[in-house]
Amino acid sequence: MCTRYIPPDVAAIEREWHVGRHNQPDWARDMHPLYTGPFIRLDAGKTRELVVGQWGMIPGDSDTRIPMSKPRGPGEKPKRISTVNARTESVHSRPTFSSAWRQGQRCIVPAASFFEPNWESGKNVWWRFKRADGRPWGVAGLWDQWTDPATGEIVPNFTMLTLNANAHPLMKRMHRPEVDPKTKAPLPPEKQDKRSLVLLEAADADQWLNGSVESARALVRLTPVELFDAGPEVQASQGGLLL
């Protein structure tokens, strides 16, 4: 599950995907859930466009742009839910994501780098993931639009897709190990559900954005480990700059 990433600048997006901002608002330089960031989708004419929207899908019947669960019984209060990631195994059936999936509202989320927690030392150490060739990542995603019932504002929003990474030599090392709810002992590796973002090559952009559901699913695969430049996050001594 990814909850932080760094978007590229607009020049890098134009070079990689041949699409520009075209009067879109600016975006956050360090993305966290519910921040505003860029994503690439097809417009009504099936042409790529760069859109700026909220990271975190908003349920269509939500009263607020903060994703909340619906009360299940009398006296139960809504709870905030996480919609920044969607599992490819269940995206077709989850209420927040299924409509966008069925309607082919697929997008690409540009990322210069993203971050995942590593617990091998017994505590959380954030790792940063870049491409070894210096190009930006293209993260497979879904998009939607939500209309604010109070103001009528249309809010584009998006999520990133994930898949199981138990077999990946790098991504299986990320995230806190799951434990047995009864014994509290770590589950064996084959019982863990390690996750990875679905990462697309630029050459596959048209297939992802404009292909059938079947052709899009063919792109849901783990990324070869040699494409990664990954390691513990390093901050400069001045200003907390990421290196």
Annotate each PLM feature.
Residues 1-243:
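Short linear sequence motif anchored by a di-proline
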